[in-house]
């Protein structure tokens, strides 16, 4: 089976990819989306969101990274796909699934689910423009409101000659509600089409992964939010490893501190780590207590000092 670390705008950046691919056996990663407008984007935009381009489009641990593009104009999507390929992208992924309101209002992401013909045009333009040895893939939801629309959408992607398709098994209207997951539609898609598929949505542990495989008939899975809830989720889903114990998560928080503070995003560190705690609290009750201690801290040094002190207390308690 394959397990892929999916994209999450504003969260799964290159620093998080580097850290999570060091402790998980991911087959590849997908970047946060590169927003395509009506012009060629400068190289620094691609390098900012995918600095791995400077090292063969791989993380430091050697995991391939695809560049994801989000936009609605076939010409400019293709032009920027060409540039990403020239910069060395391992693959080009096209975002037709982002449910964010601001993205949809500008006719990007999931908004295109209402226009399968435009999806076809974007996919075809990118596939025709990019050298054949570089895969062009897409990511969709089941539809805007009606999951039955997925078949026409998938047909558009397939007719555009995409090499692979990730299906998030909810509609845009379904948001991220667990009750809205519909893995059975991925099975129906598999039976009706020939395009290779990746299943995505509500995969939080090994049992979920196995249930998804059994329901969909697909053994390629993408994880996103869950990878932040439990940092070693990739290995849990792929190899049935135990969830990382809390003290190891704290060690990882300290490691993340080194990445963020020494990297190019140090000034954002307080917000970034607090954002991560919002996910960790879903799986680790201890995270809520630690978050209460640091949530009012605004200086990097104060947060780092508190984390070190907390880790020392854990060692004493053990």
UniProtKB/Swiss-Prot annotation:
Pfam families: Dus (PF01207)
Organism ancestry: Bacteria, Pseudomonadati, Pseudomonadota, Gammaproteobacteria, Vibrionales
Chain positions recorded as FMN binding sites: 7-9, 68, 139, 200-202, 224-225
UniProt protein name: tRNA-dihydrouridine(16) synthase
Principal EC category: oxidoreductase
Catalyses which reaction(s): 5,6-dihydrouridine(16) in tRNA + NADP(+) = uridine(16) in tRNA + NADPH + H(+); 5,6-dihydrouridine(16) in tRNA + NAD(+) = uridine(16) in tRNA + NADH + H(+)
CDD domains in the cross-refs: DUS_like_FMN
Keywords in alphabetical order: Flavoprotein, FMN, NADP, Oxidoreductase, RNA-binding, tRNA processing, tRNA-binding
Keyword NADP: yes
Record-listed E.C. numbers: 1.3.1.-
Role played: Catalyzes the synthesis of 5,6-dihydrouridine (D), a modified base found in the D-loop of most tRNAs, via the reduction of the C5-C6 double bond in target uridines. Specifically modifies U16 in tRNAs.
Protein family (similarity comment): Belongs to the Dus family. DusC subfamily.
SUPFAM superfamilies registered for this protein in UniProt: FMN-linked oxidoreductases (SSF51395)
Enzyme active site: 98
Named cofactor requirement(s): FMN
Native organism: Vibrio vulnificus (strain CMCP6)
Transmembrane feature ranges: none
The encoding gene: dusC
GO molecular function annotation: flavin adenine dinucleotide binding; FMN binding; tRNA binding; tRNA-dihydrouridine16 synthase activity
Sites annotated Interacts with tRNA: 35, 95, 176, 272, 274, 279, 295
Domain of life: Bacteria
């Amino acid at each position: 089976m394959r397990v892929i670390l999916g994209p999450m705008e504003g969260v799964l950046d290159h620093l998080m990819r580097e850290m999570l691919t060091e402790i998980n056996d991911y087959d590849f990663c997908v970047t946060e989306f590169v927003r395509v407008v009506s012009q060629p984007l400068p190289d620094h935009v691609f390098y900012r969101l995918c600095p791995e381009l400077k090292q063969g489009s791989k993380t430091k641990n050697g995991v391939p990274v695809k560049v994801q593009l989000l936009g609605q104009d076939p010409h400019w999507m293709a032009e920027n796909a060409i540039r990403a390929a020239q910069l060395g992208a391992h693959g080009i992924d096209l975002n037709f699934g982002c449910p964010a309101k601001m993205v949809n209002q500008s006719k990007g992401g999931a908004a295109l689910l209402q226009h399968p013909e435009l999806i076809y045009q974007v996919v075809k333009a990118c596939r025709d423009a990019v050298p054949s040895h570089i895969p062009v893939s897409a990511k969709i939801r089941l539809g805007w409101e009606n999951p039955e629309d997925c078949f026409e959408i998938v047909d558009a992607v397939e007719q555009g000659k995409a090499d692979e398709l990730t299906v998030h098994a909810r509609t845009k209207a379904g948001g991220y509600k667990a009750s809205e997951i519909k893995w059975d539609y991925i099975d129906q898609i598999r039976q009706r089409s020939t395009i290779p598929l990746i299943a995505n949505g509500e995969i939080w542990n090994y049992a979920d992964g196995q249930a998804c495989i059994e329901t969909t008939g697909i053994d390629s899975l993408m994880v996103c939010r869950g990878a932040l809830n439990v940092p070693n989720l990739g290995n849990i889903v792929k190899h049935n490893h135990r969830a990382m114990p809390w003290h190891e998560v704290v060690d990882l928080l300290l490691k993340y501190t080194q990445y963020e503070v020494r990297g190019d995003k140090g000034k954002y560190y307080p917000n970034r780590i607090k954002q991560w705690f919002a996910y960790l609290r879903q799986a680790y009750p201890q995270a809520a207590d630690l978050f209460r201690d640091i949530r009012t801290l605004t200086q990097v040094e104060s947060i780092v000092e508190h984390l070190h002190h907390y880790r020392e207390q854990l060692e004493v308690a053990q």
